[in-house]
């Protein structure tokens, strides 16, 4: 009997963790966008007017819980909780719930960035949060939850990143480190996440996951409610979990400890794709992209060119500040069948602490758009760049197909098919790509969705005529505005 019960428990745990890798996308949609620091009312409108019609699968939103108010309102104040009240500069609980409902209604899922590792860092005196709640972080007193000093690990600093104890029980950049093994802390975290599930979210991005013991997270995840069927989720659906674990391959706390609990952010993907498209590694080597590069298995990897943290760091990572290379890297990211894809939607920044666009009263302002739909008032909105949202459509069109017909010039010109549904070519050399290539597509004329669109039966940009053998003449000039060309069956004239 004991053996049967143990087997049943292990089977249930395994099925729960497997279910936590399912992002619950509608239809053939399969790309998440991070609308970093957007207001809830603006996200709701964006779901209805742009994301839904363009085939985006979901939105990662900024932290929803009350946070400390920091001078100048830097973006990172959102990562310093004061309570679990749903009031931030993005809006209140009513506005959040309205956004979730409206986005779900048009097939766009919501994933919340959640802070389970810590509360706010030190603050002189009494800190006031975005919902008006008072706290004394230096005393580890957070009455809005409530938490007291006994709910935290003893104060210590991380000085040795190879020391598991320090990484998981000391304070990350001075943030008060919660004790997730405590029954009270677990209950408050589960209560917070369950409230968001009741409001209709599809899952969570777990910030600083590597700073929490995997067994504590496993307990918390397995204790969560199923997703709310009133928002279109099937019965017994589990929340999608993706966890921030920075692992460059030599970490004491490894991504492998978390990959079975949910997806894991594959930071090596971001670094290596930046290296390649900056010219530090020939694109020809991308043929074995994915697990061939030592990355996580595809279904366990949350992939991205950049995120809100590493776009602010020096190094190989590409961001909107290198637009030509960034668009090529994003096209490859969305065309190559590896990982659970997320694209970034940023605001402009000059330094690490730049706040989101705000008015004189430090209220976040709504994005404004020009006649082409691009953002103009401090919001970058990469997801509205034609070269990026067109590749979201490409990714939808080729879903469930594999790479075929890989071609390269032995250097930085590459091309490949996705079954017989799509074709991508990239030129990162300083000379033209001019070649008859096998597109694997049925005969006909196709619009290049990078340089233009299919409108009223004609292409506004380049077009490629494919013959009966699937071949077409591909030209990407070294000085073309974009170094990439993409064709797919839904853009056939």
Swiss-Prot record:
GO terms for molecular function: 4-alpha-glucanotransferase activity; alpha-amylase activity; metal ion binding. The keyword Ribosomal protein does not apply. InterPro entries: A-amylase/branching_C, A-amylase_C, Alpha_amylase, Glyco_hydro_13_cat_dom, Glyco_hydro_b, Glycoside_hydrolase_SF. Binds 1 Ca(2+) ion per subunit. Binds 1 Cl(-) ion per subunit. Its EC number is 3.2.1.1. This is Alpha-amylase-related protein. The modification Pyrrolidone carboxylic acid is found at residue 20. Monomer. Keywords: Calcium, Carbohydrate metabolism, Chloride, Disulfide bond, Glycosidase, Hydrolase, Metal-binding, Pyrrolidone carboxylic acid, Secreted, Signal. Changing residue 143 to T: In strain: Seychelles-1 and Seychelles-15. Pfam families: Alpha-amylase, Alpha-amylase_C. The record marks 309 as: Transition state stabilizer. It is found in: Secreted. Its cofactor is Ca(2+); chloride. The active site is at residues 207, 244. Ca(2+) binds at residues 117, 168, 177, 211.
């Amino acid at each position: 009997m004991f053996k049967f019960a143990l087997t049943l428990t292990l089977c249930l745990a395994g099925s729960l963790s497997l279910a936590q890798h399912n992002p619950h996308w509608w239809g053939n949609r399969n790309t998440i966008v991070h609308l970093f620091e957007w207001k809830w009312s603006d996200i709701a409108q964006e779901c209805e007017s742009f994301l839904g019609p363009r085939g985006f699968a979901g939105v990662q939103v900024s932290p929803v819980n009350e946070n400390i108010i920091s001078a100048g309102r830097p973006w990172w104040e959102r990562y310093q909780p004061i309570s679990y009240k749903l009031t931030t500069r993005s809006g209140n609980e009513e506005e959040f719930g309205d956004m979730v409902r409206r986005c779900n209604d048009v097939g766009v899922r919501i994933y919340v960035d959640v802070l389970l590792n810590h509360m706010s860092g030190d603050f002189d005196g009494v800190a006031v949060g975005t919902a008006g709640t008072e706290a004394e972080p230096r005393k580890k007193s957070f009455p809005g939850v409530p938490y007291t000093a006994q709910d935290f690990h003893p104060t210590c600093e991380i000085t040795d990143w190879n020391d598991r104890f320090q990484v998981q029980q000391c304070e990350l950049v001075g943030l008060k480190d919660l004790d997730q093994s405590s029954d009270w802390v677990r209950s408050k975290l589960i209560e917070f996440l369950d409230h968001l599930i009741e409001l209709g979210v599809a899952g969570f991005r777990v910030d600083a996951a590597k700073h929490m013991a995997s067994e504590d997270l496993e307990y918390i995840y397995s204790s969560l409610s199923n997703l709310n069927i009133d928002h279109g989720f099937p019965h017994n659906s589990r929340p999608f979990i993706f966890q921030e674990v920075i692992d460059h391959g030599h970490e004491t706390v490894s991504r492998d400890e978390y990959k079975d609990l949910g997806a894991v952010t594959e930071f090596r993907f971001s670094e290596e794709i930046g290296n390649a498209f900056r010219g530090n590694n020939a694109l020809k080597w991308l043929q074995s992209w994915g697990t061939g590069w030592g990355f996580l298995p595809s279904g366990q990897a949350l992939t991205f060119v950049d995120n809100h943290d590493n776009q602010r760091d020096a190094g190989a990572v590409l961001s909107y500040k290198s637009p030509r290379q960034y668009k090529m890297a994003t096209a490859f990211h969305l065309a190559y069948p590896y990982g659970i894809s997320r694209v970034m939607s940023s605001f402009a920044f000059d330094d690490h602490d730049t706040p989101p666009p705000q008015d004189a009263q430090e209220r976040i302002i709504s994005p404004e758009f020009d006649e082409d739909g691009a953002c103009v008032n401090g919001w970058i909105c990469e997801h509205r760049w034609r070269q990026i949202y067109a590749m979201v459509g490409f990714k939808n069109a080729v879903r469930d197909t594999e790479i075929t017909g890989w071609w390269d010039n032995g250097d930085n010109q590459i091309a490949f098919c996705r079954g017989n549904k799509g074709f991508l070519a990239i030129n990162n050399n300083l000379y033209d790509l001019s070649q008859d290539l096998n597109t694997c597509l049925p005969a006909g004329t196709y619009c290049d969705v990078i340089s233009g669109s299919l409108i009223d039966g004609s292409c506004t940009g380049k077009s490629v005529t494919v013959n009966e053998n699937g071949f077409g003449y591909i030209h990407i000039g070294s000085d073309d505005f974009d170094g990439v060309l993409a064709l797919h069956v839904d853009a056939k004239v």
